[in-house]
């Protein structure tokens, strides 16, 4: 009888050991498909690197899907359809167009694949969480900063993003609210540069031909701010320039005195938190339904915080990240 009890005891210990090991085996190697809008905007490269860092920390696997043509609706739709067939464990999704990609979100939802919406908030759909920042507040605070530096007066031009893109709409809306607060500011023009450096350069060159005196430039992202600076340098003209995204290129321009400031969009951290949220949800750990980073402005007084190249950064632990 004692021998039998010992055998039962050994069997129970074996079962406990196997059961105890099962969760750890299950809690690794999750496959996460990450969708971003293009390969031309340094911001989205920061998002992808943040996603990679989070995956490494959590022992998950990330695959990136990026349209070869920037912001291509048909291409992203095709990529979504291909990914659904592959059945990843989760998807992190930035729609190239917040309205046009709603059918893609519906297909993901229909396939029962959990999805985290990051950066550009989708017009509709079912999501584990949203991770991003308030584009309106970034536009407002960066606009206020520019106007204050202009002394509350002078001529201002705006370089908008992609026409119809919610990020551009909200950032420009925030800037316009800041302009309303400053009666001494004259808004000369507001034209799209489609979030592209070269297009912004060309738009800025045309604006300088039409307007002999431009005191300030509000660019809806850092790439367009860089284009505006290049145009100003080429014409040997001066103006205060701000952008949004907090990219390394913008930090370098601020450090060099070429750019006034940039609104920090926290691209690396958006990638970190989006993948962390997706993986934690798969592991049945608590997640936050909304993770919205505060609107902060990076200038010559605090640019040091963004000097570390995104390639050299690591995601913080979840517990530390949600405290900030």
Could you say what each language-model-derived stretch is?
Residues 3-4, 25-324:
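A residue-level marker of the well-folded mature domains of exported/periplasmic proteins
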Residues 21-23:
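N-terminal signal peptide c-region/cleavage motif recognized by signal peptidases
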């Amino acid at each position: 009888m004692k021998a039998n009890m010992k055998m039962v005891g050994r069997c129970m210990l074996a079962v406990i050991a196997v059961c105890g090991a099962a969760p750890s085996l299950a809690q690794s190697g999750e496959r996460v498909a990450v969708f971003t809008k293009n390969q031309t905007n340094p911001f989205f490269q920061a998002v992808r690197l943040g996603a990679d860092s989070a995956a490494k920390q959590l022992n998950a696997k990330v695959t990136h899907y990026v349209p070869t043509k920037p912001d291509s609706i048909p291409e992203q739709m095709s990529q979504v359809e291909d990914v659904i067939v592959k059945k990843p464990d989760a998807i992190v999704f930035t729609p190239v167009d917040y309205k046009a990609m709603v059918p893609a979100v519906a297909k993901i939802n229909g396939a029962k694949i959990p999805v985290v919406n990051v950066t550009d908030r989708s017009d509709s759909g079912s999501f584990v969480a949203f991770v991003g920042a308030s584009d309106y507040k970034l536009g407002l605070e960066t606009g206020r900063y520019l106007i204050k530096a202009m002394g509350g007066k002078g001529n201002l031009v705006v370089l908008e993003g992609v026409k119809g893109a919610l990020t551009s709409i909200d950032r420009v809306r925030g800037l316009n609210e800041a302009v309303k607060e400053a009666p001494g500011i004259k808004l000369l023009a507001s034209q799209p540069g489609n979030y592209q450096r070269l297009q912004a350069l060309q738009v800025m060159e045309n604006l300088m031909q039409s307007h002999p005196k431009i005191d300030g430039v509000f660019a809806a992202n850092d790439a367009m701010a860089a284009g505006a600076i290049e145009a100003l340098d080429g014409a040997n003209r001066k103006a205060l320039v701000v952008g949004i995204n907090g990219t390394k290129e913008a930090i370098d321009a601020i450090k060099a005195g070429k750019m006034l400031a940039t609104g920090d969009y926290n691209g690396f951290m958006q990638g970190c938190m989006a993948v962390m949220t997706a993986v934690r949800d798969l592991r049945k750990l608590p997640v936050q339904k909304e993770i919205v980073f505060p609107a902060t402005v990076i200038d010559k007084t605090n640019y040091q915080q963004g000097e570390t190249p995104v390639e050299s950064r690591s995601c913080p632990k979840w517990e530390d990240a949600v405290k900030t």
